[in-house]
From Swiss-Prot:
Domain SLD: 121-248
Region of interest (Disordered), residue spans: 1-110, 178-254
N-myristoyl glycine-type lipidated residues: 2
GO terms of biological process kind: regulation of microtubule polymerization or depolymerization
Biased composition regions of type Basic and acidic residues, renumbered to the chain: 22-32, 178-191, 232-242
Polar residues bias spans: 34-45
Assigned keywords, A-Z: Lipoprotein, Myristate
A Pfam short name: Stathmin
Domain of life according to the entry: Eukaryota
InterPro entries: Stathmin_fam, Stathmin_sf
Protein name: Stathmin domain-containing protein 1
Length: 279
């Protein structure tokens, strides 16, 4: 109960607020409107309209009929993300707070589980858990699928050169000995050359055994040898007759003089020119 003006205000507010209606009532009203519009249309007007407009009208009628049924979902329904945004944007509805809906909780796989799966599949080889000091691992390669090819000729040549370049201690010692022998031979050759150039040749022992009739002068190379008169006599007798005959006493005296001169020359040569005095 109350005063008159207060009752009037309440009646006006109630008349303004529309009462909630159910979906099937709205759908039935829409069907009635569509059917009435179809009845009002004449066949002449339908012929005047183009075909695509008629098809669009039919599709709209079908959508309206489907949407009028209770519990139906329209084709152009919003995506779940949009609906979740709408729900989140309206945190308070009917006096209750709506919490944001999280996706279904799912556990992340552990690394140990992933490793076990890979080991079972054979992608990763299993490792021994016990480790020891000085433990070695052999890596084996299966060569049954593809046979190993021979290296090209160029690589073979390089390998041969490398093998030849590797020297041993024996090879080095042999080379050192050969070098020493060469050095000795060179020294001997140099000494021989010096002797032949600087030294005078020594008297041969065969000269002493020769008869005293002929004596050669050793230090005069280009001059002819001195002949005794006895030999000259024999040579002249073969070629031409002698013009004068010498006495035997003269011949003996001449032989003595020549023999003395030859001995003096040999002694001086042997005394002054010796090998020890050279070096």
């Amino acid at each position: 109960m109350g005063c008159g003006p207060s009752q009037q205000k309440e009646d006006q507010s109630q008349s303004r607020i529309p009462s909630p209606r159910k979906g099937w009532e709205e759908g039935s009203k829409a069907d009635v409107r569509v059917t009435s519009s179809k009845e009002n249309c004449s066949p002449q007007t339908e012929a005047a309209w183009p075909k695509h407009t008629i098809d669009n009208a039919k599709s709209l009628d079908q959508q309206a009929q489907i949407g009028s049924l209770p519990g139906t979902i329209p084709e152009n329904s919003p995506t779940p993300s949009k609906t979740s945004r709408r729900i989140n944007s309206d945190p308070v509805a009917n006096g209750l707070t709506n919490k944001p809906q999280l996706p279904e909780s799912w556990e992340r796989p552990k690394s140990s589980d992933i490793l076990e799966e890979l080991i079972v599949q054979g992608i990763i080889q299993s490792r021994s858990k016990v480790f020891r000091n000085g433990e070695s691992y052999d890596v084996m390669v299966d060569t049954t699928e593809k046979p190993l090819r021979k290296p090209p000729a160029r690589l073979k040549k390089l390998k041969v050169k490398k093998e030849v370049k590797d020297f041993t201690i024996q090879d080095i010692e042999e080379k050192m000995q050969a070098a020493e022998e060469r050095r000795k031979t060179k020294k001997e050759e140099i000494r021989k050359r010096l002797r032949s150039d600087r030294l005078l040749p020594t008297a041969n022992p065969s000269d002493e055994a020769e008869p005293p009739g002929r004596v050669e002068v050793p230090f005069t190379k280009g001059l002819p040898a001195v002949n005794t008169p006895a030999l000259e006599k024999s040579d002249v007798q073969e070629g031409e007759p002698l013009k004068r005959k010498k006495s035997e006493s003269d011949v003996a005296q001449m032989n003595r003089n020549y023999s003395c001169t030859g001995l003096e020359l040999v002694e001086s040569d042997m005394y002054y020119n010796q090998e020890d005095n050279i070096f």
